[in-house]
From Swiss-Prot:
The lineage of its organism: Bacteria, Bacillati, Actinomycetota, Actinomycetes, Micrococcales. One of its GO terms (biological process) is translation. Binds directly to 16S ribosomal RNA. Residues 1-25 are annotated as: Disordered. This is Small ribosomal subunit protein bS20.
Amino acid sequence: MANIKSQIKRIRTNEKARQRNKAYKSELKTHVRKVREAVTAGDKETASDALQVASRKLDKAVSKGVIHKNQAANRKSALAKQVSGL
């Protein structure tokens, strides 16, 4: 445990950010999973709708600093490729 007051505050702040990022990443995984499930089911309309939502969530995560922009681009590209393959 830190002894310096500013470091104690940073530990608290970092923990809050970690919890926030964890929740956001969990939400991202849920939306990506919905796209993949729609693709495996062969439902093109649902898959394209889910892809649109997932892409929006990925972009939002980038703007909030939760994930890197290249990671979001790679995920969106892979999902779009799967959906277009239907």
